[in-house]
Structures are given as structure tokens and as C-alpha cells.
């Protein structure tokens, strides 16, 4: 994604350049009405002032009035067309296109990105970009085109009366406007800091709402409130600093704004007194003075608003548009799984210069083999799973599925070939039907219900007031841990992928649920290559082979019975079992 702010904006503007061009033309016509009106009014005043009531050229007066009416009518029509195109054609498409692209790119980021960044912060950055894009469009059209058209036409009409006067006014106005624009650039760093802290505050707020149960259960509301207050205080101080410099610059702009009007007023009378400027010319300059001074001031104000919006977009893109850690390689092809054998070949992995978690790790998993991973926390079990899912990339060696390097295939095809049941079930705040169907988005209701029955969650679902149409709440909080996990397993059953990964998939289940689930897992695992991280003996006994890991290395390998006979590390875990769980602590 483009990280340069102006290139980012132009990328989307050029997709609607014809609509944008029509908008600019209609806006220019609309803004030309004011100086044209002033010019015609001065002509009408000239006709009246140069003749008495008996000698007024009513034909000339009538023509000017007719032209004035036509111009005002054209301005109204142009304004109506502009508003329609802007609100119906331009803004909806513009914002929708940017929203879709941001959504797509954000979801290309690695799991590490989402683990390290607060969800609320990401959302705040997206909102800042979308809102600031609209502000920049508005400020460029209204804040720049409006004053430019007004100033140029005003100078042109004054030049018809006196070219020298027009030149003097134009130069003075250009100097003052430039001075205002330059001084307002000082607000940029203040705006950027405020935008950054505001996003952090919003992220903290969302994080607190997401974890409301945790805050209440630990009685730590006062602690969270204090932390939020500290962050909010920093944000408020940044806003004060921004507002302070902005207020000073606004005062300076207003002063210069009035200076332009006063200068034009004085010059009109000087030219009238010394150089014979007509009464109509004086009226013209005075009438245009307010519009020109307002336009010059508007240029400065809008320069500051654009700078602020620029800072917010820049801040957002620095996070959201950073290069993706995990990307499909050039020419990546879809993964084709026929057998589903898996090979880890001399795999090395470490993160940010830390000690290696895996060093020349080798493991071959045959087609349809069920592998159980056992070991202390930090032994490397979860790392293996994340590398196989390509949540992270290996630092050396390779991982193959059916002799295809997973780094050379598309991530989408890789993930569609693997059904993953994590320790903590992830559910959307949607209906149970939608959550299970996520395993196969085209599945019928009957197929969803069949999967739910195999996962032994059909009975508790039908007991809910709305059955399969019941909402599960934020992250599934309306359900118990065991119920959430059974829905997660039903989703994996529906997906029916050739490779199955179980990451403590039954750890959250009570003994009765676990009894039913073990039977459904037997059906689920048939004909699939399975990798399971498990501590339940009932799960481990079903594995064809157990891999005991320590410090990223395999220290034992064999079936449950074989490893017990060896009386090694697994035997030690087994002897420390408690209530059906082996102790790996």
C-alpha cells in the first residue's frame, strides 16, 4: 500500500478523476458568481451615478440586471449539480473504495501485527484516515479553489478599471496569503502528536470494553480508570498545545485578513482621488475587498486544516501501510493436497535476535498419521503449529506439505487446507449458525446442523431461546467455555480439511463433554493428518505417535505405550498426571 500521503490520495482520486473534474468545474462556476455579481453591481451603480433619473439608460440597466439574474441562476444550478455529484457519486464511492482497500491490506498483516497492536488503535487509525480524506477533499475544493477563483476573477475585474491597481492589490494579497500559509505550517507536529495520542486513548478505551469481564472480576476498575486518565491527560495536553498554537495563528490570520480589506479600501479611495477611478470602480474594489480578504484568510485556514488532516493520514499510514511481514512470494501457486504428508526440514526459527526456538528441526509426518506434541511450556510446540500455518516465516530450512514448500504457495490455499482448533475458541459476535458455517461459507443449514451434532453441541443449541439463530455475544461470552469450544470443533468438522491441528482443543471441556467430544474427534480425525498439542491422556492415547519436545528439540518419539516403557521424560509426565491430565510443568 502507498505510504506517501499525496500519492495515496491521488491513487483514489484518479479512479474518479472525471467526476472530480466535473466537481471542480461546477465548484469554480459556483464560486465565480460572487465576483461576477460584484462586477455587475458596480456597472449598475455606474449607470445610476453617471445619470439622473430622467437620463438613465434603462436598456443598459436592464441588460445588466438580466445578466445578473442569469449568472445567479447558473450559480444555483451549478451548486445543485455539485452537491448531488459530491454527495451521491463522489463521496460514497471514494470512502467505500478506501475502506475496502484498508480492510484488505490490514488483514494481510501477520498474526504478530495483531498481537502487538491494540484493536482500538487500529480502528482509530482507519477512522482518522477516512475522516481526514474527506476533510482534505473539502478543504482543497472549498478552501483552495474557492479563494483562488475569487481572487483571480476579482483581480481581473479590477484590472478592467485599473491594471496598476489590480497588480498592486494582487502582489500585496499574495505576500500576505503566503505569510499566513507559512506560519500555519507550524501546527503540523502538534497535530500529528495529538492524532497519535488520541488513537492510543481510543485503543485503550476499546481494550477496556473488550475486557470488561476481566476488569470487573479482578475489581480493577480504579486501576484502569487511573491509567485511562493518565493517557487522556497526555492527549488533552497535546490538544491544548495544538489549540494554543492554532489560536495564536488564527489571531494572526484574522489580523492579516482585516489588513487586506483595509488596504483595498484605502487603495480604492487613493485611486479615486489621485488617478480618477470611477465611482463604479470604487464600488467594485470595496465590494470585492471583503471577498478577497476572506479568500486570502481562507487559504491560510485551509492550509492549516489540510496540514492537520495530512498529519492524521500520515500517522495512520505509518502503522497500517507498513510492509506486511508475511506475503505470498512472486508466482505463488495454490497448494494442492492429495496425501497430506508434512515435513519439517532443518527448520530454524528465532524472533528479533532472541535465542533460537528451533534449530535444524526435522520432523516427518506421514499421510493420515496422528501426531501428539508433548512438552513443557516454551518447548516449541505452539511455535511448530504457527510455522506450519505460516503465521510466522522460518529463518532457515523449509516446511513441506506433499513436497510443496509452504513458503512458495498462496497463504489462502494453505489455510483452506488446514482445520485449526485453538485452545481458546474464537467466535464472532454473530449467530451460532453463522459461526459454525464459517468453516464452509457455502454450507447449507442442514450441513451446519449435522456438524453440530457430530460435535455434540446440537442439544444445548436447541435449548437456547433462538436456537441456531442465537447471538453468542462479544467473543462468545454468552456461552460457557466448553460450549464455545464445541462450536469451534463443529466448525472444523464442517471445514473437512485434509490436515487437522488441535491445540489443547479439549482442555476447556468438562469430563462429560470431553467424553462425547473424544468420540466425535475420532470421526473427525479419520483419513486426516493430525497434529495435536494435548495434555489429556484420553487424547494422547489416540495418537499414532507422540513427539516429546524440550528447548525446540525432539527428545523422545513413539506411541504412548512405547514411551512409557522407555521411562524417560514422557514417563515422568505420566507419573505426575492429575485427573486425566499429564503434568508438563
PLM regions: where:
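An intracellular "coupling" helix at the cytosolic face of ABC transporter transmembrane type-1 domains
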Residues: 14-15, 111-112, 128-137, 141, ...
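Alpha-helical segments in transporter systems
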Residues: 18-39, 64, 68, 86-87, ...
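Transmembrane helix-loop-helix hairpins at lipid-water interfaces of multipass membrane proteins
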Residues: 20-78, 160-164, 279
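Juxtamembrane loop-to-helix connectors within ABC transporter transmembrane domains
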Residues: 83-87, 105-152, 210
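ABC-type nucleotide-binding domain
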Residues: 329, 335-585
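Helix-loop-helix
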Residues: 50-52, 157-171, 245-314, 319-320
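Transmembrane helices of ABC transporter permease
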Residues: 15, 19-29, 74, 139-193, ...
Amino acid at each position: 500500500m502507498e505510504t506517501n500521503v499525496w500519492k495515496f490520495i491521488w491513487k483514489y482520486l484518479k479512479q474518479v478523476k472525471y467526476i472530480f473534474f466535473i466537481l471542480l468545474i461546477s465548484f469554480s462556476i459556483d464560486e465565480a458568481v460572487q465576483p461576477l455579481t460584484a462586477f455587475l453591481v458596480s456597472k449598475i451603480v455606474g449607470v445610476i451615478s453617471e445619470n439622473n433619473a430622467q437620463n438613465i439608460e434603462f436598456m443598459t440597466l436592464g441588460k445588466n440586471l438580466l445578466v445578473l439574474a442569469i449568472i445567479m441562476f447558473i450559480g444555483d444550478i451549478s451548486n445543485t449539480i455539485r452537491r448531488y455529484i459530491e454527495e451521491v457519486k463522489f463521496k460514497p464511492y471514494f470512502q467505500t473504495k478506501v475502506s475496502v482497500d484498508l480492510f484488505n491490506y490490514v488483514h494481510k498483516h501477520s498474526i504478530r501485527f495483531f498481537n502487538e497492536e491494540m484493536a482500538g488503535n487500529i480502528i482509530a487509525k482507519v477512522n482518522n484516515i477516512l475522516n481526514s480524506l474527506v476533510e482534505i477533499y473539502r478543504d482543497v475544493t472549498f478552501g483552495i479553489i474557492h479563494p483562488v477563483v475569487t481572487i483571480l476573477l476579482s483581480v481581473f475585474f479590477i484590472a478592467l478599471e485599473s491594471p496598476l491597481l489590480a497588480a498592486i492589490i494582487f502582489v500585496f494579497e499574495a505576500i500576505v496569503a503566503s505569510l499566513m500559509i507559512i506560519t500555519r505550517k507550524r501546527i503540523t507536529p502538534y497535530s500529528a502528536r495529538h492524532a497519535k495520542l488520541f488513537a492510543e486513548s481510543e485503543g485503550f478505551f476499546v481494550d477496556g470494553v473488550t475486557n470488561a469481564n476481566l476488569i470487573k472480576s479482578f475489581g480493577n476498575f480504579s486501576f484502569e480508570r487511573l491509567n485511562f486518565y493518565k493517557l487522556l491527560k497526555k492527549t488533552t495536553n497535546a490538544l491544548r498545545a495544538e489549540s494554543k498554537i492554532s489560536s495564536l495563528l488564527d489571531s494572526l490570520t484574522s489580523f492579516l485578513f482585516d489588513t487586506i480589506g483595509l488596504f483595498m479600501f484605502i487603495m480604492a479611495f487613493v485611486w479615486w482621488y489621485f488617478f480618477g477611478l470611477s465611482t463604479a470602480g470604487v464600488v467594485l474594489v470595496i465590494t470585492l475587498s471583503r471577498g478577497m480578504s476572506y479568500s486570502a484568510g481562507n487559504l491560510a485556514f485551509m492550509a492549516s486544516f489540510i496540514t492537520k488532516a495530512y498529519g492524521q493520514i500520515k500517522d495512520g499510514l505509518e502503522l497500517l501501510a507498513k510492509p506486511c511481514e508475511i506475503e505470498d512470494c512472486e508466482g505463488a501457486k495454490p497448494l494442492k493436497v492429495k496425501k497430506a504428508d508434512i515435513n519439517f526440514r532443518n527448520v530454524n526459527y528465532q524472533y528479533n535476535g532472541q535465542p533460537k526456538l528451533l534449530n535444524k528441526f526435522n520432523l516427518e509426518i506421514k499421510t493420515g498419521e496422528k501426531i501428539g506434541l508433548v512438552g513443557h511450556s516454551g518447548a516449541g510446540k505452539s511455535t511448530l503449529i504457527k510455522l506450519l500455518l505460516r503465521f510466522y516465516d522460518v529463518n532457515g530450512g523449509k516446511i513441506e506439505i506433499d513436497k510443496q514448500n509452504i513458503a512458495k504457495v498462496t497463504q489462502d490455499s494453505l489455510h483452506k487446507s488446514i482445520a485449526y482448533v485453538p485452545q481458546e475458541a474464537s467466535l464472532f459476535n454473530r449467530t451460532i449458525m453463522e459461526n459454525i458455517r464459517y468453516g464452509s461459507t457455502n454450507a447449507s443449514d442442514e450441513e451446519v446442523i449435522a456438524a453440530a451434532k457430530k460435535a455434540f453441541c446440537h442439544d444445548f443449541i436447541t435449548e437456547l431461546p433462538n436456537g441456531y439463530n442465537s447471538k453468542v455475544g462479544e467473543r462468545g461470552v454468552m456461552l460457557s467455555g466448553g460450549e464455545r469450544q464445541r462450536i469451534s470443533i463443529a466448525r472444523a468438522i464442517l471445514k473437512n480439511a485434509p490436515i487437522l491441528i488441535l491445540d489443547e482443543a479439549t482442555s476447556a471441556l468438562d469430563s462429560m463433554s470431553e467424553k462425547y467430544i473424544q468420540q466425535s474427534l475420532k470421526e473427525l480425525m479419520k483419513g486426516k493428518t493430525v497434529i495435536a498439542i494435548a495434555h489429556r491422556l484420553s487424547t494422547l492415547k489416540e495418537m499414532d505417535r507422540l513427539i516429546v519436545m524440550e528447548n525446540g528439540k525432539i527428545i523422545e518419539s513413539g506411541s504412548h505405550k512405547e514411551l512409557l516403557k522407555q521411562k524417560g521424560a514422557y514417563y515422568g509426565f505420566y507419573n505426575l498426571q492429575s485427573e486425566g491430565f499429564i503434568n508438563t510443568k
